[in-house]
Regions:
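Helix-loop boundary and gating motifs at the non-cytosolic
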Residues: 2-56, 256-261, 313-317, 321-345
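Helix-to-loop junctions at the C-terminal end of transmembrane segments
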Residues: 59-75, 446-459, 544
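C-terminal ends and interior cores of transmembrane alpha-helices
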Residues: 82-101, 469-482
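Loop-to-transmembrane helix entry/capping segments in MFS-fold secondary transporters
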Residues: 43-44, 133-143, 430, 513-525
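Intracellular juxtamembrane helix-capping segments at the cytosolic ends
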Residues: 118-131, 500-514
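C-terminal transmembrane helical hairpin of 12-TM major facilitator-type secondary transporters
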Residues: 443, 455, 461-503
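Intracellular loop-helix junctions on the cytosolic face of multi-pass helical membrane proteins
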Residues: 1-8, 100-105, 118-119, 133-326, ...
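Hydrophobic core of transmembrane alpha-helices in multi-pass small-molecule transporters
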Residues: 92-96, 100-119, 486-500
């Protein structure tokens, strides 16, 4: 019994919930840092507060995948989790902008991320459950379309609220503007309604039907079992975990000590403590398996060790693909403003700031010394560049804001004008980066339906490699751009890569997974999205500050290079379920 093909509108309905999910992500990405700063967070604290997203994804998605694989009730298999996640996420979107304290906003971010992950993970598995192999590329491309549309509109919601509906975008100190609040209310409603549309307009196959479809597929195409059968006993597999886990704990402890002893950037603790934490969980799984406890933790890590070959190959591709994305998201604003816009100061202006800084008395504010210490490090770096023969340097907004806000500093009018010019250039550049991000999301939505056509003419691997290469060219080309308008052209390549990353790897993966493990493996696959994010948050600041001498543009070039590497690695992936591949074999 072959899995039936679904009409276009049925695929539309089953993917429509992603519109709401991405509205939640778009509002979060565009406004949460603003909420944190409004409630008193120092800029240096924000990356740590943002670690909620990858950590919750790392924990929640495999658990939800495992639970949904083993759920069947009158609502179905995946849809109960759509409903629970939608309710929780919608409530979190309403509460977050009304948080009176920073700790409450940070807590709501964790709840929001967990809720979004509860909803999102089963949506990936849902496509694998419902669509035959020849339609999966279209199904995941449909999700890319809704992601692009929602990201484009959601990012502009506060602007729309202010400029179209006249809702104020200013508020008393420590309060969130009404434009942001109403954007979150609207986003919460869209999230809930879009997911409910999918719940009420779709039905799911029963576990028995899915098993029959899988058996028919294996018989028709001669496919062996999609995951390796355990070739060792529980005791042997537990022993392996009991070796690997403590090794990771020890490595994490050693690296943490090195970070502490050498005074490295504190962001590196995210990586070192994370290594130890993963080791602790693996050790726990081994301990429970040794005692014949076959709960979710044991099953998740057993399945991690028994990943299908295709999934292992795709994991490496995803790792380098998402490292590039996080490099772009973190550093595009700094790269564009410092490399393309005029944020330069000459040697005389640097000397004046150094002298003014040396005359400042220590302030009593709790964060003043820390802020001034970072400004002094920047000024020392500027002096080093000038002594090396440079006639001017690129100023950081940290330095500019410090001296413009510091009322007791006596500066010449010319230097103050330079600082104001740099501030204006930075804001114009940052606004333009926001526009360019909107362009790549919008283009991703438009091009999403082109990907299945390209895959039909070539194959899924070639199409994905082309898209990643286009994205790499787009990122690297920013180094050579002098006209900001050309950034929009570069972002077309990025949009193609983004649309492909959100669809083709999942289409390839779904064909390599057994139906009864679709959810848990989609959750485990998220590891290879989250881990590069944690790695990027941990080491990119160190790399940019030391190896790249503070020039953020090279972070984009590094991202482009990792996309090229990912494009090459795609061709090593065994796409066992590619429709063209199976047609040739037949």
């Amino acid at each position: 019994m072959k899995k039936p093909r679904l009409p276009f509108w049925q695929i539309w309905n089953m993917s429509f919930g992603f519109l709401g999910i991405q509205f939640g992500f778009a509002l979060q990405n565009a406004n949460v840092s603003r909420i944190f700063e409004t409630l008193g967070a120092d800029v240096s604290q924000i990356p740590i507060l943002w670690i909620a997203a990858p950590v919750t994804g790392l924990i929640v998605q495999p658990i939800v995948g495992y639970l949904s694989d083993n759920t069947w009730n009158r609502m179905g298999r995946r849809r109960p989790y759509f409903l629970v996640g939608a309710i929780l996420a919608s409530l979190a979107l309403i509460v977050m902008p009304n948080s009176p304290y920073l700790w409450m906003a940070a807590g709501m971010l964790w709840i929001l991320d967990a809720s979004i992950n509860i909803t999102m993970e089963p949506f990936r598995a849902f496509v694998g459950d419902m669509l035959p192999s020849e339609q999966r590329t279209k199904g995941f491309a449909m999700q890319s379309f809704f992601i692009g549309i929602a990201a484009f509109v959601g990012s502009f919601l506060p602007y729309i609220m202010t400029n179209w509906f006249g809702i104020s975008n200013v508020a008393p100190e420590g309060m969130i503007p009404d434009s942001v609040k109403f954007s979150f209310y609207f986003g919460g409603a869209i999230f809930f309604l879009a997911v409910m549309w999918t719940i009420y307009r779709t039905r799911e196959y029963s576990p028995e039907q899915l098993k029959a479809f899988e058996e028919a597929e294996k018989e028709e195409h001669g496919i062996d079992e999609k995951i390796e059968a355990p070739d060792r006993s529980d005791e042997e597999r537990a022993r392996t975990k009991m070796i690997h886990g403590p090794v990771l704990i020890i490595l994490g402890a050693i690296f943490s000590y090195l970070v502490f002893n050498q005074g490295f950037a504190q962001e590196l603790y995210i990586l070192t403590v994370g290594i130890a934490g993963i080791g602790a969980i693996i050790t726990l799984a081994g301990f429970m398996q040794r005692r014949s406890m076959h709960n979710g933790v044991v099953v998740i890590f057993d399945d991690l060790y028994l990943m299908p070959k295709t999934m292992k190959q795709l994991a490496v591709v995803q790792f380098f693909s998402w490292f590039a994305l996080f490099a772009m998201w973190i550093y595009t604003t700094s790269a564009v403003t410092s490399h393309i816009y005029d944020m330069r100061m000459d040697a005389a202006e640097v000397s004046e700031l150094v002298e003014a800084g040396s005359l400042l008395e220590t302030r009593t504010e709790a964060d003043w010394f820390d802020r001034f210490g970072r400004v002094q490090r920047d000024l020392d770096n500027y002096q080093t560049q000038i002594e090396a023969g440079q006639s001017n340097v690129t100023a950081s907004m940290r330095v500019v804001n410090f001296f413009l806000e510091e009322g007791r500093v006596e500066l010449t009018e010319e230097t103050r004008q330079t600082l104001r010019r740099i501030e204006k250039e930075y804001n114009e550049g940052a606004d333009w980066v926001g526009v360019s991000f909107g362009i790549y999301n919008g283009f991703a939505a438009l091009v999403a339906f082109l990907l299945p056509v390209m895959a039909g003419f070539t194959n899924r691997k070639t199409t994905h490699a082309i898209a990643l290469t286009a994205g790499a060219i787009g990122l690297i080309s920013i180094y050579f751009i002098t006209n900001p308008m050309m950034i929009l052209v570069a972002m077309i390549g990025v949009g193609l890569a983004w649309a492909s990353i959100l669809s083709l790897p999942y289409a390839i993966l779904a064909g390599s997974l057994p139906s009864h493990k679709m959810g848990i493996y989609m959750g485990i696959f998220n590891f290879f999205i989250v881990l590069p994010q944690i790695l990027a948050a941990s080491i990119l600041g160190f790399i940019v500050g030391t190896i790249f001498d503070g020039q953020a543009i090279f972070a984009l070039i590094l991202g482009g290079c990792t996309w090229i590497l990912a494009a090459g690695l795609v061709f090593l992936v065994d796409d066992v379920d590619d429709p063209g591949h199976k047609a040739k074999e037949a």
